[in-house]
């Protein structure tokens, strides 16, 4: 069994990226490390979505991966979707470099993210903290905007 997975992201013109997942055993946190180019400067919602389906672009990826039927939240919240990874930040050059350690994301076991999609969004994820008119959507999606790139998370070759 491989302890690595990879997603190659494609989407809007010029938006590309590679994201690596590593996890030695199911009880360990998953390390998610990558680079995404071609983004507008600032924060971008970043999520694992339910389906590894790209037949209609990133729309086919479905909703956030949520096997425990929770509301949307931030990556450090107790109540959140498994797929809620928060935001990645692109610098003035449009490149986001990041490393995330997450205790809910798994590349082994019953609730693996392998075979699902990784999606980067146009806008900032509000981490389920939206108020007023935005509260209902905040608890589902984080009001993160359109999907600008996605890729299927696949088992990676051993190093």
UniProtKB/Swiss-Prot annotation:
* Main enzyme class: oxidoreductase
Gene name of this polypeptide: SOD
Top-rank lineage group of the source organism: Eukaryota
EC no. given is 1.15.1.1
Family that this chain belongs to: Belongs to the Cu-Zn superoxide dismutase family.
Q: Where in the cell is it found?
A: Cytoplasm
Which transformation does this protein catalyse, written as a reaction?
2 superoxide + 2 H(+) = H2O2 + O2
Chain residues that bind Cu cation: 47, 49, 64, 121
Q: Name any GO cellular component annotation.
A: cytoplasm
The molecule here is called Superoxide dismutase [Cu-Zn]
- The SS bond pairs are 58-150
**Which co-factor is required?**
Cu cation; Zn(2+)
Functional summary from the UniProt entry = Destroys radicals which are normally produced within the cells and which are toxic to biological systems.
What parts of the sequence cross the membrane?
Answer: none
Q: Annotated Gene Ontology MF terms?
A: copper ion binding; superoxide dismutase activity
- State if Zinc is listed as a keyword: yes
Kindly give the InterPro entries that the UniProt entry links to this protein: SOD-like_Cu/Zn_dom_sf, SOD_Cu/Zn_/chaperone, SOD_Cu/Zn_BS, SOD_Cu_Zn_dom
Record's keyword terms, sorted: Antioxidant, Copper, Cytoplasm, Disulfide bond, Metal-binding, Oxidoreductase, Zinc
Note on cofactor: Binds 1 copper ion per subunit.
- Residues at which Zn(2+) binds: 64, 72, 81, 84
